[in-house]
Design a protein with these regions (language model features):
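Sterically constrained small-residue positions within well-ordered secondary structures
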Residues: 13, 27, 36, 46, ...
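A short, structural micro-pattern
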Residues: 16, 107, 114-116, 237, ...
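C-terminal catalytic domain of Rieske-type non-heme iron oxygenases
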Residues: 52, 128-321
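Non-catalytic accessory segments flanking enzyme active sites
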Residues: 9, 15-16
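A general structural signal for short secondary-structure junctions and capping/turn motifs
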Residues: 11-12, 35, 112-114, 244-245, ...
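Rieske [2Fe-2S] iron-sulfur-binding domain
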Residues: 2, 8, 21-141
Length: 321
């Protein structure tokens, strides 16, 4: 990795470890194999006849055949199209059509995989360690109190660390998102858990000098999932964001939004439309910055910049040397 005057290409030379979202459960049919590209590599995701979803590296340990091209799931096993070797739910080879002695180390590289709330997630660790944390748990919200979840999706041509760091960069709210003061961010760190709280004022009209106070709480237990709660005297909103690296400079962002309902459904609809429009506009503003900035390993910070370096230290624990 080339370094010039404190400028580096990446936050890390490795991909982060943790649980990451790959797709909706409904996108993967029974006995189907899909090829996906994440973590700067190709993977396959398949579903057995009993309904179990599994993420695997795609190459057969025999002679390197790619199971994502004409491979087949038959019941609970997956077959390599090259020589017909079969692999069971543990990843080990269970049958060779033309041989009796199975090499004891003939095993596909399965990744820990779960399905939760209609989504398929996998655990990534380039050192191949078992998961040290539980997968993120999404909130189960009462539909009588909260609007139906709205799904938004972006491909951002920027590394994951740049995107998630925005949650603790409070001063940018004044310049990118039109806060009328200079917000401050407080940070609580407990192991792999982080909570960032920010309070900012936004004007609701050109003549409004005082503005409306909006409080934001961002929670995360790893780089792949962020829950944000936004509250003011006019709205309470929740966003749950899944961030999955495609490669070192591209991140898939999937966001699920909801707001707390007003007693009056017409008012709720008006607030929702306004919130959604502004959320998309704000994300696009951030996206432009993320995709055009560079990463500075040793930024020149002032006293008003807040806990950026503390946040980076927290995030670094998910990246192996």
């Amino acid at each position: 990795m080339e370094k010039k005057a404190g400028i580096v290409n990446r936050f890390s030379d490795t991909m982060p470890r943790g649980w990451f979202r790959l797709m909706f459960s409904e996108e993967l049919k029974s006995e189907e194999i899909k090829r996906v590209n994440y973590f700067d590599q190709e993977l396959i995701v398949f579903r057995t006849a009993s309904g179990t979803a599994q993420v695997s590296e795609p190459y057969c340990p025999h002679l390197g055949g790619h199971l994502g091209y004409n491979g087949k799931v038959d019941g609970e096993i997956i077959k390599c199209p090259f020589h017909g070797w079969e692999f069971d739910k543990t990843g080990f080879c269970s049958r060779i059509p033309y041989g009796n002695k199975i090499p004891p180390k003939a095993k596909l590289m399965y990744w820990p995989t779960i399905e939760s709330n209609g989504q398929i997630l996998c655990y990534h660790d380039h050192l191949k360690n078992d998961p040290e944390t539980s997968p993120p748990e999404r909130l189960l919200l009462n539909t009588e109190t909260w609007t139906p979840l709205h799904h938004l999706s972006w491909i951002v041509k920027a590394p994951l660390n740049e995107i998630i760091e925005g949650g603790v960069d409070a001063p940018h709210l004044s310049f990118i998102h039109s806060a009328i003061d200079y917000p401050k961010c407080t940070l609580e760190i407990e192991g792999e858990k982080i909570i960032a709280n920010t309070s900012a004022n936004y004007s609701i009209s050109p003549d409004d000098k005082k503005g409306v106070t909006v409080k934001t709480e961002m929670q995360s237990c790893g780089p792949g999932f962020v829950r944000t709660v936004i509250s003011s005297d006019k709205i309470t909103a929740i966003s749950e964001s899944f961030l999955t690296p495609i490669n070192y400079n591209t991140t898939e962002v999937q966001i699920f939004l909801t707001i707390k309902k007003n007693i009056n459904s017409i008012i709720t609809e008006h607030i929702w439309k306004s919130y959604l429009q502004n959320f998309i506009l704000d994300f696009e503003r951030d996206k432009l910055v993320w995709e055009t900035k560079i990463f500075l390993e040793t930024p020149k910070l002032c006293d008003g910049d807040g806990p950026i370096m503390a946040f980076r230290k927290w995030l670094k624990q998910f990246y192996s040397s």
